[in-house]
Each structure stands twice: as C-alpha cells, then as structure tokens.
Amino acid sequence: VGTSEKIVLQGVDEIASLIKHLFTAGVDDLVGRTFDMEAAYRQLAILPSERPKAVICVFDPVLNKVRGFTMATMPFGAISSVYSFLRTAAAINNVGCSLLGLPMSSYFDDFTVVTRSEFSKSANLAVTTSFDVLGLNLSTSERKNIDFAKVFNALGVSFDLHKEVGDFFRIRNTDQRICELLGRIDEVLAANKISGKEAKSLRSRLSFASAQIYGRTTASVLKDLGKYEGNKDRVKLNGNTRLLLRIMRGHLESGMARQVSFGKADVVHIFTDGSLEGDADSGLSAGLGAVLVDQHGKCIKAFSYEPTQDDVQVVGGKIHQLEKLP
C-alpha cells in the first residue's frame, strides 16, 4: 500500500497510560470494558467501481477448473484491508474521544473504554449508539459483550482498577493466557524437542506475557530460545534450555503482576556500574558503585566499593557479574 501516513496502534501501554492519567487527576472508582466489532473486516464494503479488481480465485473440484469470486467487502488479512480498517478504527476512536468525551482507545477491532462507575451506563449507551449511527455492529456474544467492571480483560491482559495502598494499579496476564503458555512449555519439555517455528512462536508469546510480570527472568529464556529459531526440524533441548523453561514456568505461575504507580511522589533515578581492569597474571582491579539522583539531576546519595582479589575471584572475574552487584 503506497501511503505517507502511519497508523499508530494503541496497545496495553496506552490503556495503562489512560488509566494512570485518570487516577492521577483524582478520578476514583474507575471501571472499564472492551467493545469488540463483529466480523470487523466484512463490515467495510469495497467501492462498487473497484470490485472488478477484488477477485478471489478458488479451484472448483466439481467443474475441475478455477473460478473467480468478486468480493463485496474487505478480505480479512489483506494488506490493503488492514490499512483501510485501521484508518476506520482510528476515526471511530477519534469520534469517541473528541465528540463524545470518552476515555477511549482502539487496537484493531477492540475499543477499550475506562470511566467512573457512575458514568458506565451512559458511556455504554454512547458507544453502542455511535456504532449504530455509523451502521457498524458490535459483538453481542456472552464471551465478548461483558459489562463494565473493576477488573476487565483487554488485548490478552487483565486490568485491575482497584486502587491499592501506595497509589498503584495492577496489570496481569489473563488466566487463559497463563494456562495456554504453561501447556505449551509442558509439551516442549515432555517432547524434549523443539523446531525453529515452535521456538519462534513460543518466544513471541512469552515476550508479550513477560511484560506483565515483575522481574527480568524472561530475558534469559527468550535469548536461549532464539538459538533454536534457525532450525527447520525439531532438535533436542539442551540442559540449560530445560532449566530455563522450568524457571519460566514457575515465573508464570507465581510471578508478581505488573504495577503501575500514579502517585505524586518525587521521581528518582538510580545509576549503577562496575569496572574490571587488568588480567589474571598481573592482577585484577575492580570497582563498583551507584548514584541516586533526583528528578532535577541533583545527587542525593552515592557510594563506591573496591572489591578485593578474593571477591573478584568469587564472581569468576566477569565484569557483567560486577555490574549487577550494586
């Protein structure tokens, strides 16, 4: 598609930013929900004059020949369809935000709205009415048409809008996503083999899930799985991969959910570093330290430490180990 414009998708971080802004502004008792379009691409018609160019060819086993079918709506997954739909979704979102004053975001055919509990009915009416006026259909299935709530799911994660002591709210992976990932890890461990395609898929899904779990455990797992992506056939897992997958499994089950703070506490920055010079023959000289700086760049606290030769040997003489110590 030739275009000079780029459509910016509003994902999990944008929804989190919206919630944080409302909490910071003093808006309490927030609830949220997601509105999902029914068969989204099929709701966008192709211009009648352009339909002769929109033809799908399918082999007919009865007539034993290829037949062409003219499309009346956007074909799902086609590049032009995606771009055109994203423009439509962005326009709908702009109507909700600018004209209706709704705290709203959009991601493909999912529209997330966050509002006060007392305004939830009017917000629901505003969204459904605007879609009716535009001639677009929202999903009415029980699985997707879920009312406003303190805890709601959007884009594969769960937003918990209970205001915690310390002024923060939580974002975690949905139970369904956790169960699915645990099942896939168990399958890989049981088979003790993985193909490049399987490794790439698992790595991608673990990368998304890890963003909602506190800690850096996943980084090592993702790096290790990347080594298998070039393999066409299934290859045997090495011992390190099995260990990392088991650690990741426990991290998914019991890892602390992502916390987003919205309080007015002062911002501080912590800078840490380590150094290592010399060699084993002449002796190693090491150092490490940290600096605590306020939001204006003023140093609040700092420390430095020079490890002994024995200390350096304990960490194996590796600079990356020293850099982690502060």
Positions of PLM-derived features:
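Active-site palm subdomain of RNA-directed nucleic acid polymerases
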Residues: P61, V82-S130
